[in-house]
Amino acid sequence: MNLDEYGGASKGLIWDAIERGLPIEKYIAKKHFSFMTLNYLITVLSAKHNLDDFPFDEYDDDQIRHLLAAVYFQNDWKEWANPKMKHYIMEMFVTVKNPQELLYYYNRGFKYRELLQIYKFINDGFDPKVVDNLNFNFQQMREIRKALRGRLPVKDLANPNLTWKEIRAKRIKAYGHRYGIEFYIKNYDKL
């Protein structure tokens, strides 16, 4: 086992894992890992998860880190992961309540910013079918999600022909002009 390519902090992690009896040598012999990925790997091995069939060769370091998090949280990553998926999209799949629903939108070609809004729809407990339309951009989706969180009916707002500013204006107007603006200013960071 050659540890020369690892920095001091990474070497310390590896030696600590070896002293604890974790089988880390067989994984680091195959591939070089970053410090963060080593942390995830050691955590997963400490939790007694089996990584014998884990495809380390198919994924890059960032992707492996998110897949190890999925293994740790017992998320079935084999249903949604593929080597072409960006690591920041994988991060959403690890923590989303319904990965199959997010996968549906990912396969339809939604970009990261739109997927992030869909992810928030799902985790807030709303049905993302409200914006099941490729004509919506992420700003329109964000305003519709804010309306749903404010318990407003979105029939009039879920119109791809409206700009996000028009949707925001209708949303504030639905709260009542005075109350809507006060609510918007006080709760901007929560919406």
Q: Which sequence ranges carry the predicted segments?
A:
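General marker for long, soluble alpha-helical cores
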Residues: 1-191
